[in-house]
């Protein structure tokens, strides 16, 4: 191979020499590729022709064989970005680097997230590459107080703005002279006075624009700094030219534009300050989550209570929490009982009763009892830490709707500069032939009215505020793409057990005396069946004392038979009673039929061969399940139930909550296929589940929604997590998505519309440069302000919300 390149990849999943040989053989089948795979080091070294192949092709080949390639992720803080052209350029350069799988740069958060192959590159190389582009970059420090850093930066912007405004205000008065024929002191019209005021604004306050423009042009790019630097420099240096003519006596009335350059810079700084201030509010939701974390814990060591910093708590430590204190970390109660306010997690204001062996979540509030607990999850593994991580990732992610804005931003500045040059040529040759000033003013107006910032901020600000507001309500979107996809959903499929129902059977009906119940519970107490557990718990709630069984026998398919204190007990169905010649009165038979029709498991009880009672057990509906289904129907969304239960039970539950479509008797492995069937009908499907067996269906669906009380596998497979299991959050999640996407469209319409309309108006000479500059400064502020409206959105779905 004449032109060769070498790359090394870390491979995961190899177990023997056959694995490494298989990968090596497959890679070497590619044209002009020489690959060696080492099982011991778990690395593949590949020499290849870069004109024919790239690293991603080798990764796809390895993954297609069923193995993985190690990928690491790093988050970087970037400062110095001024508009969408900056973030687009950094993103493009990072994605072209060897070893980078994917890089996204968020202008709003001023952060980059990069997935890379550690054998090809590292975080330091990424930082260095960004710095070469002219921006400051560093690896994100999670322990660093980002809020105070941003507050300092905002304060610095304000100081520069004030200084610039003080120097520009006298120059601004000159504009009023031209506009309103006002009289002002002669000093204000003196060229030297104007020069002294404008120069520090241009080259000290405005130096940042020159630096930004130079760095971008040096690296073959162009951003907002280029537009500002060129536009203000044109006005400033033309004024210098006129001033020299005045000093030489060539003119007694120089046409100076010092006020244009200085006021433009001041207005742009004002817009940037307002933008930064508004952007800081977009992360309020994350700041509020961070503020929920406990700062210290009371640990029990050698019989003594000690207060220690939260970061010193380890798994297995014994902690004491008193009334009014926050639970420091996730754990399990080993002593005491209390009520816990979990509203920060679930949004539910009513405290939850907690006893020994119950789990407690870090940062929730202990209301009224002292408890002793064992720490089970600490640091970054706690529930709150995971919530914060999901919200951070969602806020820094990109929605597919942003792609068009990103593409346009990359070409925006060169196009605007070209339009400005064309404007100058047309004016000086056709509109006002040979007259320099009108051509200059029109071209400056074109340069300064164009705003790539609004394009870059349109989507990420809405995503940040929208996902933050959703998180405050217990709805966690994993990323911008899930926000965008959710608004398209027209069909929602709900798992039954643990999703629509509580997943814990309870006694719903009982007819009989306490003695019969005591004997029944005693007979069932050694069984691990959920129905037996429900009966035993019911008896304990009645404070009945359970004794011991003398004999016990299960009657397969029919029930049980037991002897307790010389009493013969039969518990089961009609067949069991009939086999023992026990007749059923009509009202008992009718009750049995009624319970079965309602999807309940009904059991007859006979003591000493006489019917003494009937009991019904069922998995109860979750609170608000019926209301949630109704809201989804009101939004025009079809709702279906998917369950492995028999059709009668499923139909009974569906009838109670108002679900029309029931898919029952489904094996766990068939759930994903049922989702695919609905998708083949052209439906956009969301699957809601909580168990391990729901994970394939959650992945297959257009959107997977996991119930937060469910398994980690289900939560990992889903794009949205509903904290606490309240089904009312499902229509709220869909509404949050719709409201956020609607807000993004408004922003994009404004950003595109502003530039499409503003640039031609400026080119026609209908706007003074300072008016154009003010419009540019306020355009990005308006986009951020519109996004901030989402902070106040009430997550109340509308009927058939579009």
Swiss-Prot record:
Residues 5-70, 72-138 form the HMA domain. It catalyses: Cu(+)(in) + ATP + H2O = Cu(+)(out) + ADP + phosphate + H(+). Its EC number is 7.2.2.8. It is found in: Cell membrane. InterPro entries: ATPase_P-typ_cyto_dom_N, ATPase_P-typ_P_site, ATPase_P-typ_TM_dom_sf, ATPase_P-typ_transduc_dom_A_sf, HAD-like_sf, HAD_sf, Heavy-metal-associated_CS, HMA_Cu_ion-bd. It holds the Pfam family E1-E2_ATPase. Disulfide bonds: none annotated. Cu(+) 1 binds at residues 16, 19. It comes from the Bacteria. The active site is at 495 (4-aspartylphosphate intermediate). Mg(2+) binds at residues 690, 694. GO terms for cellular component: plasma membrane. Cu(+) 2 binds at residues 83, 86. It is a multi-pass membrane protein. Its main location: membrane. Keywords: ATP-binding, Cell membrane, Copper, Copper transport, Ion transport, Magnesium, Membrane, Metal-binding, Nucleotide-binding, Phosphoprotein, Repeat, Translocase, Transmembrane, Transmembrane helix, Transport. PROSITE patterns: ATPASE_E1_E2, HMA_1, HMA_2. Involved in copper export. Belongs to the cation transport ATPase (P-type) (TC 3.A.3) family. Type IB subfamily. This is Copper-exporting P-type ATPase. It comes from Staphylococcus aureus (strain bovine RF122 / ET3-1).
């Amino acid at each position: 191979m004449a032109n060769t390149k070498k790359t090394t990849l870390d491979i995961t999943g190899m177990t023997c020499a056959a694995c490494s040989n298989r990968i090596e053989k497959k890679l070497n089948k590619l044209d002009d590729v020489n690959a060696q795979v080492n099982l011991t080091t778990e690395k593949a070294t590949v020499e290849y022709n870069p004109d024919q192949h790239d690293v991603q092709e080798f990764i796809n080949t390895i993954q297609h064989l069923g193995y993985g390639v190690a990928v690491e992720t790093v988050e970087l803080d970037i400062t110095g970005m001024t508009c969408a052209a900056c973030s687009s350029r950094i993103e493009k350069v990072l994605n072209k680097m060897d070893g980078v799988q994917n890089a996204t740069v968020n202008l709003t958060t001023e952060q980059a997230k990069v997935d890379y192959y550690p054998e090809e590159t590292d975080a330091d190389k990424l930082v260095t590459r960004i710095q070469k582009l002219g921006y400051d970059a560093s690896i994100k420090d999670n322990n660093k107080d980002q809020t105070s850093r941003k507050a300092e930066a905002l304060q610095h912007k304000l100081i520069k703005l004030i200084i610039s405004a003080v120097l520009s205000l006298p120059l601004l008065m000159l504009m009023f002279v031209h506009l309103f024929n006002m009289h002002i002191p002669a000093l204000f019209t003196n060229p030297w006075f104007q020069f002294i005021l404008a120069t520090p604004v241009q080259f000290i306050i405005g130096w940042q624009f020159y630096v930004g423009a130079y760095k971008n042009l040096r690296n073959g790019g162009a951003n907002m700094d280029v537009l500002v630097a060129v536009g203000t420099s044109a006005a400033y240096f033309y004024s210098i030219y006129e001033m020299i003519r005045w000093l030489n006596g060539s003119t007694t009335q120089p046409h100076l534009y010092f006020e244009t350059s200085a006021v433009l810079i001041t207005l742009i700084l004002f817009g940037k300050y307002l933008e930064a201030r508004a952007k800081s509010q977009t992360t309020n939701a994350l700041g509020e989550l961070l503020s929920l974390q406990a700062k210290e814990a009371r640990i029990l060591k050698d019989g003594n209570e000690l207060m220690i910093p939260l970061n010193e708590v380890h798994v297995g430590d014994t902690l004491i929490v008193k009334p009014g204190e926050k639970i420091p970390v996730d754990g399990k109660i080993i002593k005491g009982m209390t009520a816990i306010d979990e509203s920060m997690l679930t949004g539910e204001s009513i405290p939850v009763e907690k006893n020994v062996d119950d789990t407690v979540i870090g940062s929730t509030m202990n209301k009224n009892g002292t408890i002793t607990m064992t720490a089970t999850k600490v640091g970054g593994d706690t529930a709150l830490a995971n919530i914060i991580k999901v919200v951070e990732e969602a806020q820094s992610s990109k929605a597919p709707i942003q792609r068009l804005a990103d593409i346009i931003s990359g070409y925006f500045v060169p196009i605007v500069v070209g339009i400005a040059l064309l404007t100058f040529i047309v004016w000086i040759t056709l509109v006002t032939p040979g007259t320099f000033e009108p051509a200059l003013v029109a071209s400056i107006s074109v340069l300064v009215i164009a705003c790539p910032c609004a394009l870059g901020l349109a989507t990420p600000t809405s995503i940040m505020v929208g996902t933050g507001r959703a998180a405050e309500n217990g709805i966690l979107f994993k990323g911008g793409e899930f926000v965008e996809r959710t608004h398209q959903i027209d069909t929602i499929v709900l798992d039954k057990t643990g999703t629509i129902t509580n997943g814990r059977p309870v006694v719903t009906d009982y007819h009989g005396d306490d003695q019969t119940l005591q004997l029944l519970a005693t007979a069932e107490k050694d069984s691990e069946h959920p129905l037996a557990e429900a009966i035993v718990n019911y008896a304990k709630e009645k404070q009945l004392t359970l004794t011991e069984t003398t004999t016990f026998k299960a009657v397969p398919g029919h029930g049980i038979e037991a002897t307790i204190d010389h009493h013969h007990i039969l518990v089961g169905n009609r067949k069991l009673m009939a086999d023992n010649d026990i007749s059923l009165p009509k009202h008992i038979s009718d009750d049995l039929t009624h319970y079965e029709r309602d999807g309940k498991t009904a059991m007859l009880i006979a003591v000493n061969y006489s019917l003494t009672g009937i009991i019904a057990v069922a998995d109860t509906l979750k609170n608000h399940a019926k209301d949630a289904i109704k809201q989804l129907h009101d939004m025009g969304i079809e709702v279906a139930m998917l369950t492995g239960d028999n059709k009668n039970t499923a139909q009974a539950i569906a009838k109670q909550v108002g679900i029309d479509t029931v898919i029952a008797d489904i094996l766990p492995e068939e759930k994903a296929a049922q989702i695919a069937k609905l998708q083949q009908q052209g439906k956009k499907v969301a699957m809601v589940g909580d168990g391990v067996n729901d994970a394939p269906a959650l992945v297959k669906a257009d959107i997977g929604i996991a119930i937060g009380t469910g398994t980690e596998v289900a939560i990992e497979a889903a794009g949205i997590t509903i904290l606490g299991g309240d089904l009312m959050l499902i229509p709220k999640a869909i509404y949050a998505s719709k409201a956020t996407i609607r807000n993004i469209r408004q922003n994009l319409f404004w950003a595109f519309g502003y530039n499409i309309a503003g640039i031609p108006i400026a080119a026609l000479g209908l706007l003074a440069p300072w008016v154009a500059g003010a419009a540019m400064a306020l355009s990005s502020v308006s986009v951020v302000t519109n996004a901030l409206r989402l902070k106040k959105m009430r997550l109340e779905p509308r009927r058939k919300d579009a």
